[in-house]
């Protein structure tokens, strides 16, 4: 959920996570099982399709297509393997992310870092914390790049799936105008601010990621 924190900032509170179980005996294809459960979870928690961020890289693109057809085309596709955006690195660093980060996934992982450092991200699962702290990165070249997922999995024996899910939540917030900042926020100047100000402290429409 998203709302006003006691530190004067608007932040993200991670309240729950769910691992979708696949029924091997079902005649329904795996991706359709996942899509069905994702939609059910979103509807149970009042998450609108336009507030659902999904990793559209690789097989994720097929899942996006299914959800777009069976639920709504307004779901938010995120190409983790794509190019970094032209958004500023932060309110204090006006350089384009595409000038600093080698790819989108690096941009998103460092965006989470910004939100955590500025005390705007709370309730992170212990497993996700370990994943964020375990992934290596290289900032000695012209552009910063994080370790490839396949390399991290080979090195640690685990894929950073919990951490990737959190990056999608933060990306959803950023798409709505949310940003990490060292300063207290003074007014509703973005769609993100307005959404929170229009509600009683906590914004009851929630966001999700896959």
Regions found by a protein language model. Give the residues of each.
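Mg2+-dependent endonuclease catalytic cores in nucleic-acid-processing enzymes, primarily RNase H-like
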Residues: 2-143, 191-210
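Acidic two-metal-ion nuclease catalytic site recognized across multiple nuclease folds
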Residues: 135-149, 153-210
């Amino acid at each position: 959920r998203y709302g006003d924190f006691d530190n004067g900032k608007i932040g993200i509170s991670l309240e729950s996570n769910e691992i979708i179980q696949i029924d091997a005996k079902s005649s329904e294809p795996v991706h359709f099982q996942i899509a069905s459960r994702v939609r059910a979870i979103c509807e149970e928690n009042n998450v609108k399709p336009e507030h659902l961020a999904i990793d559209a890289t690789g097989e994720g693109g097929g899942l996006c297509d299914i959800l777009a057809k069976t639920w709504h085309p307004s779901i938010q596709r995120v190409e983790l393997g794509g190019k970094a955006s032209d958004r500023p690195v932060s309110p204090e660093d006006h350089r384009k992310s595409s000038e600093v980060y080698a790819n989108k996934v690096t941009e998103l992982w460092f965006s989470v870092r910004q939100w955590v450092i500025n005390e705007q991200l709370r309730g992170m699962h212990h497993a996700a914390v370990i994943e964020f702290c375990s992934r290596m990165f290289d900032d000695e070249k012209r552009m910063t790049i994080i370790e490839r997922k396949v390399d991290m999995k080979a090195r640690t024996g685990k894929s950073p799936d919990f951490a990737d899910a959190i990056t999608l939540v933060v990306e959803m917030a950023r798409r709505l105008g949310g940003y990490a900042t060292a300063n207290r926020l003074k007014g509703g100047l973005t769609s993100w601010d307005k959404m929170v100000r229009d509600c009683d402290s906590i914004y009851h429409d929630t966001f999700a990621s896959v």
